[in-house]
Each structure stands twice: as structure tokens, then as C-alpha cells.
Amino acid sequence: PAAPEIYNDLGFTPHVDGEPFNTYRGLVMAGYQGWFGAPGDGCPHSDHSNTAWYHYRENDRFEPGVLRNSIDFWPDMSEYETQYTPGKFILPNGEKATVFSSYDESTVMLHFKWMKDYGLDGVFMQRFVGEVINNPDGKAHFNKVLASAMKASNQYQRAICVMYDL
């Protein structure tokens, strides 16, 4: 009988830091959306009350008591250079809670730094057709995030591939 096909065999040479990526074979990749936004981050989304807390809010609201805010857990903000305060959210220690904006280049740079620090080779930069077609604010947001990701991927030598969710 034919030999069974082997999956997940490490028959590849691991990537060497400082060398360009010539294949994705054997790399540890993640998906990266970069879809969070906040008032004051400079994105056109923040000019509109219903999209100011982009992707944090549910039904145009991001506030305590809303049953379905669209984050699963609060981010650890201790390493973020720029932080945004969404109103009345209070941490257990009594401090006002803060969040990040993916539109802010320093956020994307930090995420790519973490990828390098923790051995993640790179990302599939996920872009959503519905967010960029006939949507100038969405296109501006995601083009800025992509530009920041390209800069960060070069600085931290992480692989990057653009993929579209159709």
C-alpha cells in the first residue's frame, strides 16, 4: 500500500532574522484586522457619532451597560504609547479604562514588535471588501492601517501578506 501522506512535518528550514521571506512555508502566521478606532485618532470614522468608537461599539454605542459591546475582553494597555478614554468605563482599581486605536501607527508598531518578541513570523493582513468599497471612511482607515503594517513589518522583519475577505 501507498505510504500515508504526512502532515505537519517540519521538513523546512526555519526563517533566519535579517533575511527576506521567500516563502510562507513553515512560518507561524496570524490574521491581523486592525479595525479598532477611537475619537481623536485622526480617522474620518471619528468624525461621526455612530462610528467614532469604530468596532468597539454595538448599535452605535460603546458604554457601560450595553450588553453587546463588540470586544471580548479589555486590552492590557500598559505598553501602548497612545491611549483613548471611552467615557465611563472604570477598571476594578477605580481608574478610567483606556483602549487603543488601530488607526494610530504606534499601535500597529507595538503589535509587530510583540510578534517579533514572541516568535510570530508575520501576518495575513485581512481586508474586508465591504469595508473599503464605496466607503471612503473605511477605505481611509484600512489603507492607513495597511501602510502602518507595511512599515512595521519592515522595521521588525515580519512577513506580511494581504488577503481579502469577500
Go through each PLM region and give its residues.
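Glycan-processing catalytic domains of CAZymes
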Residues: 1-166
